[in-house]
Amino acid sequence: MKIIFMGSPEFSVSALSYLLENESHEVVAVYTKIPKPAGRRGRILTKTPVHIIAEQNNIEVNTPKSLKHDAEQEKILSLNPDVIVVVAYGLIIPQGVLSIPKYGCINIHPSLLPRWRGAAPIHYAILSGDDKTGVTIIQMNELLDEGDILLQRDIPIDEQDNIDTLSKKLAHLGSSMLIEVLDNIDNLVPIKQNNDDATYAHKIIDFHIDFNEAADVICRKVRALYPRAFLLFNGKRLRILKTSYYSDSSVQDLKPGAVIDSHMNIKCKDGVLVPLVVQMEGKNPCNIDDFILGYNVLNCSIA
């Protein structure tokens, strides 16, 4: 089967690698996000992980800013794909592209659709305390994550899973499912999603810890936003990379955000947050025991 692969971040690499290792299918081209300026004054262009893997395997790479133009759609048509596989590409796939391949466009989505449609499904599964999540492979249409389900499988969410570890698990699950779908595509019976059960995982832009939330909620936030959740420590950004929590009725009269002991345990709206691994801006990550050696945490400012 001739395949065009569309993907960009590290999550997409596993699926592309599975396809490249499978002799039954041929990746004729890769589409990925345009390289981003990086380094001083933006003089260095950083390619996506998918871009790098494709070049290493001598596959044609295309980085259009949009797929809406006729010229781009004609180029895809000329490649004569049997199917287009989309995994966290980052661009809208217009109807003109969806209708080109014999088998249309299929998408690997890391949630149990229709739960957690949208940009951040893995984050929201952790944030919401879901006990399981999974991968859904859908036949794409023009609506966001609303296509018919071709295959769906679930996995448990471990109490210690963060966005990094859970993403890797789902990437490998989705990759094996992709091969199964492609090998059996003529025999699959698509299942329509129930829109009444839909929930949405919008892009997350706020990574600041709010101690007016319960300690268990903050712990999930640290795992879901790893490694970006932070608080302000004496006015400087301190990333919180790993935590635990406990209940303590003796501190219930303290204000949320108060440091309650020399280990820098912090009062929350409900419960006490225990930072375990932290990272001060400009510094390397360290265990909390090493961090507090350099500070009088009982007299610090936490916000």
Curated annotation (Swiss-Prot):
Reaction(s) the record says it catalyses: L-methionyl-tRNA(fMet) + (6R)-10-formyltetrahydrofolate = N-formyl-L-methionyl-tRNA(fMet) + (6S)-5,6,7,8-tetrahydrofolate + H(+)
Keywords: Protein biosynthesis, Transferase
GO cellular component: cytosol
Binding site for (6S)-5,6,7,8-tetrahydrofolate: 111-114
Tree of life domain: Bacteria
EC number(s) from the headed UniProt entry: 2.1.2.9
Gene3D superfamilies: 3.40.50.12230
InterPro entries hit by this protein: Fmt, Formyl_trans_C, Formyl_transf_N, Formyl_transf_N_sf, Formyl_transferase-like_C_sf, GART_AS, Met-tRNA-FMT_C, Met-tRNA-FMT_N
GO molecular function: methionyl-tRNA formyltransferase activity
Family that this chain belongs to: Belongs to the Fmt family.
Matching HAMAP family: Formyl_trans
PANTHER family, per database record: METHIONYL-TRNA FORMYLTRANSFERASE, METHIONYL-TRNA FORMYLTRANSFERASE, MITOCHONDRIAL
The protein, known as: Methionyl-tRNA formyltransferase
Organism: Ehrlichia canis (strain Jake)
